[in-house]
């Protein structure tokens, strides 16, 4: 358990992880001395890797929760803030959090406490990518809309950019 616990501490010291993400990383093959995934020193590629007991992983996860090293709500909040600063919209961030195994209710709660103006963020992202003056021609507008949809913004947020622009 000590090896697994030290591995969990090392992972969590680098950045926050969701419980599901940490569980997956702990169950995977351990680091070698050189730091490469899936390669252990003194083992040939044909030898099977010993499976890690799920009970031990549960104990490590519980220990991390007890010491407040692991918290899905904190992870979701920091992830939303981090990804929004990089110019991603709520829809994409929500999808990424679900892929990382965060509970829907925790995601919703994290979005409710975040004080991000998604319409303003969409406008800033569009201006950063396409220029300060947003296009008014249909063909160019479609490019902006497609880009913002790809970045995870909702159609209403994209439309608000042009509604504010017209007024």
UniProtKB/Swiss-Prot annotation:
Main location: cytoplasm
Annotated InterPro entries: RecX_HTH_1st, RecX_HTH_2nd, RecX_HTH_3rd, Regulatory_RecX, WH-like_DNA-bd_sf
Subcellular location: Cytoplasm
Protein name: Regulatory protein RecX
Entry's Gene Ontology BP terms: regulation of DNA repair
Residue ranges of the TM segments: none
Originating gene: recX
Function: Modulates RecA activity.
Segments of this protein annotated with the region Disordered: 19-49
Species of provenance: Yersinia enterocolitica serotype O:8 / biotype 1B (strain NCTC 13174 / 8081)
Any single Pfam family the record assigns to this protein: RecX_HTH2
Similarity remark: Belongs to the RecX family.
Any one of the GO CC terms: cytoplasm
Swiss-Prot/TrEMBL keywords: Cytoplasm
Domain of life: Bacteria
């Amino acid at each position: 358990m000590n090896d697994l616990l030290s591995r969990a501490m090392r992972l969590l010291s680098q950045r926050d992880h969701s419980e599901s993400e940490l569980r997956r990383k702990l169950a995977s093959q351990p680091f070698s001395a050189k730091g490469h995934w899936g390669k252990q020193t003194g083992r040939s590629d044909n030898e099977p890797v010993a499976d890690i007991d799920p009970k031990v992983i549960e104990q490590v996860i519980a220990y991390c929760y007890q010491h407040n090293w692991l918290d899905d709500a904190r992870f979701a909040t920091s992830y939303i803030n981090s990804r929004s600063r990089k110019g991603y919209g709520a829809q994409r961030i929500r999808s990424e959090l679900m892929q990382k195994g965060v509970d829907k209710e925790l995601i919703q709660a994290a979005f409710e406490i975040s004080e991000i103006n998604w319409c303003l963020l969409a406008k800033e992202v569009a201006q950063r990518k396409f220029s300060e003056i947003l296009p008014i021609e249909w063909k160019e507008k479609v490019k902006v809309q497609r880009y913002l949809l790809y970045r995870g913004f909702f159609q209403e947020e994209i439309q608000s950019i042009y509604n504010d622009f017209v007024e």
